[in-house]
Amino acid sequence: MKTPIRVAVTGAAGQIAYSLLFRIAAGDMLGEDQPVILQLLDIPQSLPSLKGVVMELDDCAFPLLRDITITDDPKTAFRDINIAMLVGARPRTKGMERKDLLEANGTIFRAQGKALDEVAGRDVKVLVVGNPANTNAYITMKNAPSLKPTSFSSMMRLDHNRAVFQLAVKVGQPVSSVRKMIVWGNHSSAQYPDLSHAEVDGHNAADLVNDMAWIETGFIPVIQKRGMEVIEARGSSSAASAANAAICHMRDWVSGTPEGDWVSMGIPSDGSYGIPEGVIYGYPVTCQGGEYKIVPDLEISEFSRMKMQASYRELMGERESIKHLLG
């Protein structure tokens, strides 16, 4: 039997985590032969509720689940971990400006970055789900200087999956036929879902759709606004779909992307595609051996470049507002 992998999940008593933890314990993320130890973090007032979640996990009798720790201390939660899924974040409340949300969450992720730096395994893989995810990931990374920058990522996979579904519906094919979707930039309404390189059963998606008006006024805005539409429909934000995206993101990062396909991940920019260093930016990547690599040499249209730069400018604006929290 393999050595158990230690997985930390923050915001562990919350809605996304409730859809996430049982799937991790069942082997959906790391495989059906990989034991796991869950190290769960939440704020003190949520620990009674979290104890109930742990009771449910116990009652599932998952063969792969070796142990569970619950705590309100980041250092306890992150000690010797291999994977961190930073789900917990302060939600935006009525009347709250985005800069106030950035500040409130920046303080949380600064502390978590410092704790990761001090006690996490040196090979740790960190996925930030809590919004604003890209900038929260950047704050976490900058406060963990002893860890490799490539250890940090933010979640673009929910946007990616949404884009795959919308394209599949448009062309009347199953989602399994869609490959090479990209969502560039920030996980926000400035993101750029790009189907210009996507394929449906090996055929170029843009050629199949053959409708630039739909791409510009249908496809792109639908993906950008989908999260808000979910909130309006169910009264709360995406939870099960976000948890599923987190599972997909980490599974592919650890085990590799399928042959002939790529995925979208928020990662530290390195100058690729004209995006300067200094932000966590959504890129198309392939994963192998636990490492990701940006897909090189894609042709970028003027329309795409304009959208990509707009998302970059938004990220730079976010970074400017929290620069005092960067280590």
Curated annotation (Swiss-Prot):
NAD(+) binds at residues 11-17, 105, 112, 129-131. The active site is at 187 (proton acceptor). It is an enzyme of class 1 (oxidoreductase). One of its GO terms (molecular function) is L-malate dehydrogenase (NAD+) activity. It catalyses: (S)-malate + NAD(+) = oxaloacetate + NADH + H(+). Substrate binds at residues 92, 98, 131, 162. InterPro entries: L-lactate/malate_DH, Lactate/malate_DH_C, Lactate/malate_DH_N, Lactate_DH/Glyco_Ohase_4_C, Malate_DH_type2, NAD(P)-bd_dom_sf. Pfam families: Ldh_1_C, Ldh_1_N. Keywords: NAD, Oxidoreductase, Tricarboxylic acid cycle. GO terms for biological process: malate metabolic process; tricarboxylic acid cycle. Its EC number is 1.1.1.37. Belongs to the LDH/MDH superfamily. MDH type 2 family. Catalyzes the reversible oxidation of malate to oxaloacetate. PANTHER family: MALATE DEHYDROGENASE. HAMAP family: Malate_dehydrog_2 (MF_01517). This is Malate dehydrogenase.
